[in-house]
Amino acid sequence: GEISYPLEYKFLICDDQQQPLYWEEDENRVLNLPSQQVGETVIVSGLYFRDNLPLWRCAGSVIPVFSLRSEKSFGVGDLGDLRMLVDWVRKTCQRIIQVLPMNDTTTTHTRTDSYPYSAISIYALHPMYISLPDLGELADPEKAAFFARKQAELNGLDAVDYEQAVRYKLEYCREYFRQEGEAILSTSEYREFFAQNESWLMPYAAYCYLRDMYRTSDFTQWKENSVFDKNTIRELCSVEGKAYPEISFLYFLQYVLHT
């Protein structure tokens, strides 16, 4: 029937079987709204559960992932170092780890991209967080030795050299992609990842490709590509298209980061 005002109510917490666990404290709440028109929705916000339950407290650590540099790092903290932090937090009986955003922030390929809150995607992670030891070894001994020297140089710095770390980590990833990319992209795991994330992965890869092609992140300067069009994006990212070698590399980076 029709709801009449004033309406009295209370909040309660239920378990998975919808059985009441805890009613909130104090007197009933009172809701007194003016009459609504058909189809009108009224939202009452700012409400909170009133209780005398003790507040949950714990110890934890707050740190940007890029600061978690270890001997296995490549000049900047990465996901491999984050796993080491998880082990340390557990050993020290902490319960929470809070990190700064890890989203991709690449717009200029310079150190101005290092600000972690300037994300270009809410889904894509920054390629610099790829753990190269976890990614795999390069088969070419000369290239492996070259990157080992660069790793030692960057790890020996007192502070993170953002541009150099990102540059050489991406170069390593490209070498590894040339070596193993075709095999990785043909796996069922990768195909499943792509199917589940295509809605954001394809536009993200297209954006990165066009940003680098036009040498600017200002999409208004991308000529015929300045207006977003799904069909154009799908054509650009087509397996048969000339851009696909770079597009597939961008897919590969996100696959590695998310799995």
List PLM regions with ranges.
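Acidic/aromatic-lined carbohydrate-recognition and catalytic surfaces
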Residues: L53-T259
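The feature marks proteins involved in alpha-glucan
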Residues: E2-C58, D113-S131, G136, R149
